[in-house]
A protein has these predicted regions:
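Carbohydrate-associated surface elements
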Residues: 5
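Conserved donor-binding/catalytic core segment of Leloir-type glycosyltransferases
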Residues: 15-32, 38-41, 54
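A conserved nucleotide-sugar
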Residues: 34, 38-79, 160-164
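Aromatic "clamp/platform" in nucleotide-sugar-dependent glycosyltransferases that forms part
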Residues: 83, 102
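Short glycine/serine-rich donor-binding loops of glycosyltransferases
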Residues: 87, 107-110, 130
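Short hydrophobic beta-strand element within catalytic cores of glycosyltransferases
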Residues: 119-124
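Conserved acidic donor-binding segment of nucleotide-sugar-dependent glycosyltransferases
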Residues: 125, 135-137, 141-148, 156-162
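A short, well-ordered alpha-helix in the C-terminal region of glycosyltransferases
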Residues: 150, 157, 164-178, 187-190
């Protein structure tokens, strides 16, 4: 399988101190399973109250998801950012990126996050996109769909173990070269 090349507009990896923020990006629809992310964040937040969750995206579940954040007691720690032209800059400096999709091909948000070196947690979802590029525990973390505890534990593991998180981020950056326009172009040319 030949993947699509990474957009040249994706910012370079960030090497500074990461913000105490978990980020996720995607339409506010059932497929993206933001409910799982909010529930996992609530569990994580009970042990890490100085962290916030930023959700980027718009959709029909906006009101329901805000209600869930309130129900879980984290409304003040969850921000719904909607559409943002600088979403990549926000993700790039975050502590962790999470994608909890129920089904997904190769998510651009996931690939961008990995290529920027952000420690990334994704679900093993139908479509297998995350499993095509993430080696669990090596360049990211995979969890089962709706396994809220596993996702919360993965968040905690990454923020509590900065050396591990840094190592995962460094290995994830290797995708940047693998997805460069030049590398992908060479793969296509070799087929012709």
């Amino acid at each position: 399988m030949i993947l699509n090349p990474l957009s040249e507009s994706v910012p370079e990896p960030y090497d500074g101190e990461r913000r105490k923020v978990i980020t996720t990006s995607g339409r506010l629809e059932e497929q993206k399973n933001h409910e799982m992310t909010i529930r996992a964040f609530a569990r994580f937040h009970s042990l890490h109250p100085d962290y916030r969750l930023e959700i980027f995206g718009e959709g029909s579940l906006d009101v329901r998801l805000r209600g869930l954040a309130a129900e879980e007691g984290v409304a003040d720690a969850v921000s719904f950012e909607g559409f943002s032209p600088n979403v990549l800059d926000c993700i790039r400096t975050s502590a962790v990126f999470v994608m909890s999709s129920r089904f997904e091909g190769l998510s651009n948000s996931m690939l961008e996050s990995l290529c920027m070196g952000v420690p990334t947690i994704c679900t093993r979802c139908m479509g297998g996109g995350a499993e095509a590029v993430i080696v669990d525990g090596a360049n990211g973390i995979l969890v089962d769909i709706d396994d809220v505890e596993a996702e919360a534990n993965a968040m905690a593991h990454l923020v509590d173990n900065s050396e591990y998180a840094k190592a995962i981020g460094l290995r994830a950056r290797e995708l940047r070269q693998q997805l460069s326009l030049e590398t992908i172009g060479d793969k296509w040319l070799s087929l012709l």
